[in-house]
Amino acid sequence: MSESLEELAAYLKSKLGDKLEETVLAFGELTIVSRLDAITDVLIFVRDDSRCQFINITDISGVDYPCRDKRFDVSYQLLSPRHNLRLRVKVRTDENIPVASACSIYPGAEWYERETYDMYGILFSGHPDLRRILTDYGFEGHPLRKDFPVTGFVECRYDNEAKRVIYEPVVLRQEMRNFDFLSPWEGAQYILPCDEKTKDKR
């Protein structure tokens, strides 16, 4: 399998050349990073070329790296049933620059791109219906971004008296707590309150 991936990596480098920013073969997986303006050409090539035939798209997801200028990775997971190989294609972007939609290349990409937009706010140009798919209509923000608060902004609940769903500011029933768990391998560095057994053993 790894020999097949090494051959495929060399082949893709030779054919796609400057359309690729990076090729990584690690842990038995091949990842290629496409230039943003070349993502359509790269996806069409790996789908149609006889040595690739990655005709199935199994997922599109996002990853947020807030410290980078291009903070988002869009990751396409592709499968070639003919060659029994998998390929990950990545492209990097930010909040304002859209990624070309893969819907015309892989018809199953439509909902994956909507989910990526909903969770991360990544824009896809040429998408036929780019709107939220998992969160509510009035939802503010994108919940899988690293800068999105863990508690969210609002909470919704069904009000039995009003007979409708209502939105309210988040009310925390208790302060955020920091749990200091002990490592079973290191043992306690200090004696916990009310732990006389440990105190007696020392």
UniProtKB/Swiss-Prot annotation:
It catalyses: a quinone + NADH + 5 H(+)(in) = a quinol + NAD(+) + 4 H(+)(out). Its main location: membrane. It is a peripheral membrane protein. The keyword Cell inner membrane applies. It comes from the Bacteria. It holds the Pfam family Complex1_30kDa. One of its GO terms (cellular component) is plasma membrane. It is found in: Cell inner membrane. Keywords: Cell inner membrane, Cell membrane, Membrane, NAD, Quinone, Translocase, Transport, Ubiquinone. GO terms for molecular function: NADH dehydrogenase (ubiquinone) activity; NADH:ubiquinone reductase (non-electrogenic) activity; quinone binding. Its EC number is 7.1.1.-. NDH-1 shuttles electrons from NADH, via FMN and iron-sulfur (Fe-S) centers, to quinones in the respiratory chain. The immediate electron acceptor for the enzyme in this species is believed to be ubiquinone. Couples the redox reaction to proton translocation (for every two electrons transferred, four hydrogen ions are translocated across the cytoplasmic membrane), and thus conserves the redox energy in a proton gradient. Belongs to the complex I 30 kDa subunit family. NDH-1 is composed of 14 different subunits. Subunits NuoB, C, D, E, F, and G constitute the peripheral sector of the complex. HAMAP family: NDH1_NuoC. This is NADH-quinone oxidoreductase subunit C.
